[in-house]
């Protein structure tokens, strides 16, 4: 599907090498989508953990199992299993596993949402902006999500654990500015 890509704020990886320098500029990457069976670079994972220290949410793409950990437990991602991972940097809500992505979308427990950015007008000290938006999306048909999320200057990954599928919604995940930082991108 993808080959040799890294993008901001999502990193799409097909190949990895532990000797490679981390392509992560400070305060940027939070989500990693790994769709192959090669373990990721420890330096990439460590850097993501350091700059986004407030939680780690993972959905494994082989069985769509979700787990939530501390960012410091990044070595869990040293696996051959494909996954989508979100390293949290707190902007709204408290630091807790409950406030770590992905979020269940309302009462539809098959639908999950990961998000990068801040949604104006959403969130509080008790609930993150992403969690509030996920709850709202849960009351809408999935087909309406694209229109709703395109209104925000943000990027989203919507995951359906029953259908074992995911898609990108909202702003384009591809950042042309990132190629300067990306040793994995082959021209």
What are these regions (language model features)?
Residues 1-74, 83, 172-187:
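Extreme N-terminus nucleophile/cap motif
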Residues 16, 24-27, 48-54, 98, ...:
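Catalytic core of PPM/PP2C metal-dependent serine/threonine phosphatase domains
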Residues 59-61, 104-106, 159-161:
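A generic structural motif
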Residues 79-81, 108-110, 153:
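Short coil/turn connectors at secondary-structure junctions
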Residues 86, 91:
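Regulatory input/activation interfaces that engage signals or partners
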Residues 92-112, 147:
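Acidic loop->beta-strand submotif enriched in PP2C/PPM serine/threonine phosphatases
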Residues 110-123:
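Conserved beta-strand-loop-short alpha-helix elements that form
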Residues 120-175:
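Short histidine
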